[in-house]
């Protein structure tokens, strides 16, 4: 009995203590909740009631999760659809949500400068896409690799070892050889048939030049074509390169809905794998053999970009770069060379043949600066201001692509008063910047004179981002000097050495863009004739 009474008493005491503890815990929780609520209330009261969180840039309302992807799939090419949205909304900055990604499009130079000058470091990354992963061998390169240690490493190598002013001067002879080869090749085409396909010719000149700088040779074939033109191997390589360029940032559905990667719903993945494999087929044997030669001591002199990549050492004296880094970086740089210069020269020639007065002025300038007793050289470029004004106008009015490569926001920010969330992909519109009527009078008219300034030398770069020739900022073009040399020398040699007219029964070029990209709808074909003494034309070597 005493035992029962004692146990009952203990249970009563325990229950009382438990009840007291629960009450105290509940009170403590309530006190904490009240305190947090008061703090939040005070913070809200202290906040400026008129200060609102900035809105996203204007844009269409999409579906949950998938955003505007259904509309995107029906609206090809996507770049025209995005520009039509901006036109409908009458805005110079817009936001279109694709999956969970905010795609921000910009056509205003002032906003572009805010992004690439004032907030450049914040927009220094690239998106993760299937195409990039394939081309960069798992993000080991410079141009298309997202921001991080690997990007910094490769960017430093490219900027300090490959495209610095000293290297540019050092490789002058190789560029000069390709300028002469272009003149010899065009001479042979003019003498044999008179007809020249400018798209084919300009692309392969640029391809020859970058191959010479990269590998020390202009061709992937053991045998060269007698007239100086590309071989079957070179043509296959060039076609694969341009196919890859067309699909590197092509609004692939799996880039916005990653769970669809592998299904290849729009065929982009197969195209990228095949085109990348073709380029690797030509690049990799040369790279592997060269690495072996350096390792065995059979090659000790640096003669081209590939030698530079292989010979760079780290602080311990070991090779800084692996083959897995060298191969995709070379592929990336080779791809970066041909499209922009070749497109500008083809459009410039098309515009000039429709406006003979511009063509006449350009040839008069070359004759005045250079004469007809020698060939134009890179040293003449500073004085060829009208020729460069023509090229600036071609870059402005006829950009090689509708948008620059995407810039990814590394954190939340505000641009032009609008909220830009972390991870947003910002697309600067080459098309919209160059044709912005608030910036350019009569923007659809080809007027080289608008770029002339008596007080200064004309350059192809555009630092104020009123148009984009060679992009700027941390992710800008690494080699504007090389781009300027290739583009200007190509046009100058074609104008100095030859007169040009349209084929028989054609009176003007139809200046129409392709239905799926920004290239001229039909490749420009013209008939040439010699305008210099024959002894000045180089021979194919």
Curated annotation (Swiss-Prot):
Q: State if NADP is listed as a keyword.
A: yes
Query: What does it catalyze?
Result: L-tryptophan + 2 reduced [NADPH--hemoprotein reductase] + 2 O2 = (E)-(indol-3-yl)acetaldehyde oxime + 2 oxidized [NADPH--hemoprotein reductase] + CO2 + 3 H2O + 2 H(+)
Its tissue distribution reads: Found in all tissues tested. Highest expression in roots, and low expression in stem.
Uppermost EC category: oxidoreductase
Residue spans crossing the bilayer: 21-41
Instruction: Please describe, based on the UniProt annotation, the reported consequence of changing residue 477 to A.
Output: Complete loss of activity
Q: Does the keyword rRNA processing apply?
A: no
Q: Which GO terms describe its cellular component?
A: membrane
Q: Which InterPro entries match?
A: Cyt_P450 (IPR001128), Cyt_P450_CS (IPR017972), Cyt_P450_E_grp-I (IPR002401), Cyt_P450_sf (IPR036396)
- UniProt GO BP: camalexin biosynthetic process; defense response; defense response by callose deposition in cell wall; defense response to bacterium; defense response to oomycetes; indoleacetic acid biosynthetic process; induced systemic resistance; L-tryptophan catabolic process
For binding heme, which residues are annotated in this chain's numbering?
477
Question: What's the protein's topology in the membrane?
Answer: Single-pass membrane protein
Enzyme Commission number(s) from the entry: 1.14.14.156
Q: Which cofactors?
A: heme
- Localisation per UniProt entry: Membrane
Q: What keywords tag this UniProt record?
A: Heme, Iron, Membrane, Metal-binding, Monooxygenase, NADP, Oxidoreductase, Transmembrane, Transmembrane helix
Write the signal peptide boundaries: none
Q: Which GO terms describe its molecular function?
A: heme binding; iron ion binding; tryptophan N-monooxygenase activity
| Family indicated by similarity | Belongs to the cytochrome P450 family.
The record's function comment reads: Converts tryptophan to indole-3-acetaldoxime, a precursor for tryptophan-derived glucosinolates and indole-3-acetic acid (IAA). Involved in the biosynthetic pathway to 4-hydroxyindole-3-carbonyl nitrile (4-OH-ICN), a cyanogenic metabolite required for inducible pathogen defense.
**Name this protein carries in UniProt:** Tryptophan N-monooxygenase 1
- Record lineage: Eukaryota, Viridiplantae, Streptophyta, Embryophyta, Tracheophyta
